[in-house]
A protein has these predicted regions:
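A short acidic, Gly/Pro-enriched loop at the edge of an enzyme's catalytic core
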Residues: 99-110
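Conserved beta-strand signature within the Rossmann-like core of class I S-adenosyl-L-methionine
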Residues: 138-144
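A short SAM/SAH-binding and catalytic strip from SAM-dependent methyltransferases
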Residues: 110-122
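Conserved class I S-adenosyl-L-methionine
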Residues: 1-41, 54-58, 78-81, 148-157, ...
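A short glycine-rich, Lys/Arg-flanked "PGG" loop and its adjoining helix->strand segment in the class I
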Residues: 124-136
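Class I SAM-dependent methyltransferase SAM/SAH-binding core
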Residues: 46-48, 52-100
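Short alpha-helix
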Residues: 162-177
């Protein structure tokens, strides 16, 4: 992948306005994944690569009014779609690169990242940045509302062991970035890897 995010912006910007209508049935899967992140009232959580902010209402529900929810995305058009959908009421929206976040070290209890890892130009560096902003013992959810095989089929590809989300690749990638993989689910209707911040 390129070192910049032009390819990500070029892909998502023209699709932002109708992104939610293209995948209208994903909402419950987001809510279930957020539920498995183990958030508590008052926690601080980041939705990294938040897109149109589909996870923000569930994240706000989990941390309550005393918690902090931040949604960061590198594509302005996706954040604009989140605003049109009224999701800024669930969290603060920030135009930011997930690999260079405008957050202090160790300020988050958890990070939620739906579909993000395959869009990071340097995945270990990007996951390391997510670890930097998470406290020791903080949690990470790498999520997609469909599993690897279904996603590969959607894009006209065959499933490959080279996929970053394949467990044999993901486990050492996370470890090198400061995370320990705790659970891994790759099913037809979802992908969810949960990790804990080490150190």
């Amino acid at each position: 992948m390129a070192d910049d995010h032009t390819h990500v912006q070029d892909f998502f910007a023209p699709r932002a306005a109708d992104w939610d209508s293209r995948f209208p049935d994903d909402g419950p899967a987001f809510a279930v994944a957020v539920g498995e992140l183990g958030l508590s009232p008052g926690d601080a959580v980041l939705d990294a690569g938040c897109g149109t902010g589909r996870a923000l209402p569930a994240l706000r529900g989990a941390v309550g009014p005393g918690g902090t929810v931040v949604g960061a995305d590198v594509t302005h058009a996706m954040l604009a779609a989140a605003l049109r959908a009224g999701r800024e009421s669930s969290g603060t929206l920030v135009l930011a690169d997930a690999a260079r976040l405008p957050l202090r070290a160790g300020v988050l209890d958890a990070v939620f990242a739906a579909g993000l890892i395959s869009h990071l130009p340097h995945p270990e560096q990007g996951l390391g940045e997510l670890a930097r902003v998470a406290r020791p013992g903080g949690r990470l959810a790498l999520f997609h509302p469909i599993g690897r095989a279904a996603l590969a089929a959607r894009h006209g590809r065959t499933l490959s062991d080279d996929d970053l989300r394949a467990e044999p690749r993901l486990t050492p990638l996370l470890a090198g970035a400061g995370w320990r993989l705790e659970s891994y689910a790759d099913e037809d209707r979802r992908f969810l890897a949960l990790a804990v911040r080490t150190g």
